[in-house]
């Protein structure tokens, strides 16, 4: 074997090792001191914390800085008007900082072993006394799934199912690809996803846990939840890994259906 071929082989092996076992944390860029299938240091994996706020909607668990948007029963305007579509929401953290970077590694860079870490996060916020008959992952349109190679919500659903002993049922179907939701109001988002989902089987009387990775306004998840209810589901809860923090954003009254001030 010539020296050139040997050097090329060594370079290829080193490149493969660095790819599989990178020497820097992909979140903080600090040197990795342990060999792991997850290219993230233990400190960054432990950094995300459950969402905290002074006030929450009792139904969708949206965080607020004051009681102003909540009625006497503790519900926000969207839940009071039945615009969310689901019966309860459980979410782990805020979609920013380290948690956002971890989700990007999982979702866009294919670091699938993170699903076990995320399963631990979700287990912290899902009440053990709740009973579910099936866990349903939020479906991707087939083109998006083909491009990404996997459905991140499906991986999260499988991890929760493994921990809870509840079956995964892939009964939600995305009928059409929807335009990007970024920059749209909640009302526009709801219109954007109207009729985008369908249930593939009857769910009469079932309590469903719908699993998604990130909750923004809830328009997409709400549309899917309504499709499951049209198929007979008695109760649909949403479990999300992260939600965008909207506490300091006072929303447009007409678009968001918040109560007007006197």
Regions inferred by a protein language model and the residue ranges of each:
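Glycine-rich phosphate/pyrophosphate-handling loop used in enzymes and phosphotransfer proteins
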Residues: 1-212, 216-262
């Amino acid at each position: 074997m010539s020296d050139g071929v040997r050097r090329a082989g060594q370079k290829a092996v080193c490149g493969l090792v660095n790819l599989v076992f990178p020497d820097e944390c992909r979140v903080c860029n600090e040197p990795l001191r342990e060999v792991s299938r997850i290219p993230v240091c233990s400190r960054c994996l432990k950094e995300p914390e459950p969402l905290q706020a002074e006030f929450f909607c009792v139904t969708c668990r949206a965080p607020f800085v004051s009681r102003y948007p909540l009625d006497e029963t503790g519900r926000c305007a969207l839940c009071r008007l039945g615009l969310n579509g689901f019966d309860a929401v459980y979410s782990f953290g805020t979609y920013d900082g380290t948690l956002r970077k971890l989700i990007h590694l999982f979702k866009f860079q294919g670091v699938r072993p993170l699903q076990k870490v995320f399963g631990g996060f979700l287990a912290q916020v899902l009440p053990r006394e709740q009973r579910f008959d099936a866990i349903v992952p939020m479906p991707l349109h087939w083109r998006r799934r083909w491009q990404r190679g996997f459905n991140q919500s499906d991986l999260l659903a499988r991890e929760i199912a493994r921990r809870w002993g509840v079956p995964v049922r892939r009964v939600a179907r995305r009928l059409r690809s929807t335009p990007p939701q970024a920059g749209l109001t909640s009302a526009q988002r709801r219109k954007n996803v109207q009729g985008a989902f369908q249930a593939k089987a009857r769910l009469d009387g079932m309590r469903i846990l719908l699993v998604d990775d990130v909750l923004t306004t809830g328009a997409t998840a709400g549309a899917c939840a309504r499709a499951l209810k049209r198929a007979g589901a008695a109760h649909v809860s949403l479990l999300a890994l992260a939600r965008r923090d909207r506490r300091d954003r006072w929303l447009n009254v007409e678009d968001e259906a918040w109560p007007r001030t006197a």
